[in-house]
Amino acid sequence: MLARGDGASLKLLMENKRKIWPRALLLSTVFLLALSGGFFFRLWPELHRPAPIDPAFRFAPAIFVASLPTAARFDFPMGSENGALTYNAQRFTANRHLGDDLNGIGGENSDLGDPVYAVADGRVLLARDGGSGWGNVVIVLHAYLENGERKYVQSYYAHVDTILVAPKQMVRRGDQIATIGTAHGKYLAHLHFEMREFATPFIGPGYRDDTRGWIDPSAFIAAHRGAPDDDVGRVR
C-alpha cells in the first residue's frame, strides 16, 4: 500500500496503467481476430461450396422426355389389369390422401411380396429409398395422347419392398418393377399409388390439402385403359 506522502509514486503507477491497458486491449483484439479469422478461413469453403441438389428436385432432361414411347393404354399396378383381386383401403383425397392405398383381397400382410407392375410404357425417373414413412419408391414417366395432344403423366409406387428397375430404364406396360412392401415395417403391406401431372421426380408429402398436380389414380386408369373390363390377363 502506498503511503499518503507517496504522491509521485501513485502518479507514476497511474501513468503506467494508462500505457499498459491500451496495449493489452490491442493484443486481446488481435488474438480474438486471429481466432475468428482462423475459424472463418476453415468455414469459407463450406460457405461457398454449392449445395448438392436433391434428385427429387431435378427436372427430367428434355431428351429424356422426348424419347418416351407413347403409351397406348394404362392398367392397374397390382392384381389383374383391371384392378380385380385388390381393394382400395384409402382413396384419393380421403383424409387429404394424394393417392390410393391398394391391398390384396386377403388383407393384412397377405400381399407382401406380390408383384407391382408398370401401369404403362414409360421410363423410370426414380428408384430408391424415399425416406421416413415412404420406404422404397419407384416413379415412372409416361407419354400418352389425348385428343391428338401428347401429354405426360407420372406413376408413383411407394412402400415397395424389392425394387426391380433402375433410373432411366425403359419399361413396358405389365413389366414387374417392384414387390409389395411395408415401408421397412412401418405399415401393413400395401401399395401407395399415385398418378401425377408433372415430370419432376418428387417424393412428395403423401397427404396434402392442395391436390393440384395430382390425379385420381383409379379414375385416370379407368379412363385410359383402352381395354374391356373383362380383359383381366396380363397379356400385352
Placement of each model-derived feature along the sequence:
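Short histidine-centered loop motifs in beta-beta connectors
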Residues: 110, 117, 148-174
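Conserved, short, structured surface segments that act as functional micro-motifs
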Residues: 138-141, 169-235
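Active-site-proximal beta-strand/loop segments in catalytic clefts of secreted hydrolases
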Residues: 105, 120, 127-128, 141-143, ...
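Hydrophobic alpha-helical membrane-insertion segments, chiefly the h-region
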Residues: 31-42
